[in-house]
Amino acid sequence: MTHAVAASPPSTRHLVGWSGKARRFGQSLHLREDELHDLLLQAPEVIAENLLWIGAQIKTGNGRKLDLLGLTRCGALIVIEVRRSENAAEALAAAIIHQQWARSLSIHDLIGHYEEFCGGQLLVDFYNAFADAIELSGNVTLCVVAPDVRRIAASIAALDASGIGAFGVEFE
């Protein structure tokens, strides 16, 4: 999956997709990390089309918390790590750790996280959103949201080339 390229003035946000391409997303943001979480929760299409949020601030069992976890229509999980500070490399390292944890999740685990997150019934809500049953693909894609994602573009491209789906969302 690739994203279209568009000219972008310096004050815009960019989405760096699987292909390493960038597209204009929006205006300059001066938000706290929790506000970025809220923005992403309200606009999941920034991360992926047909995305259902499974949870936020999920305890992963290794003393860390995963910022956001989404499930695509095709059954792939997306691990989102958000950093307000200019340290995308740190966010990428955390996302890789979370990816390993996410790979071990069963459908029952996802149901539990979803119920804790929004009180909904995952199987019903997924069907209502996508008119389909959940079939986990086993794929887990990494997403880093940080102001300096371009600094780690080579690392993201290397992960993607090795078969680990990865992309970033950059903002000012």
Name the predicted role of every residue range.
Residues 1-172:
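Charged, terminal alpha-helix-loop-beta segments
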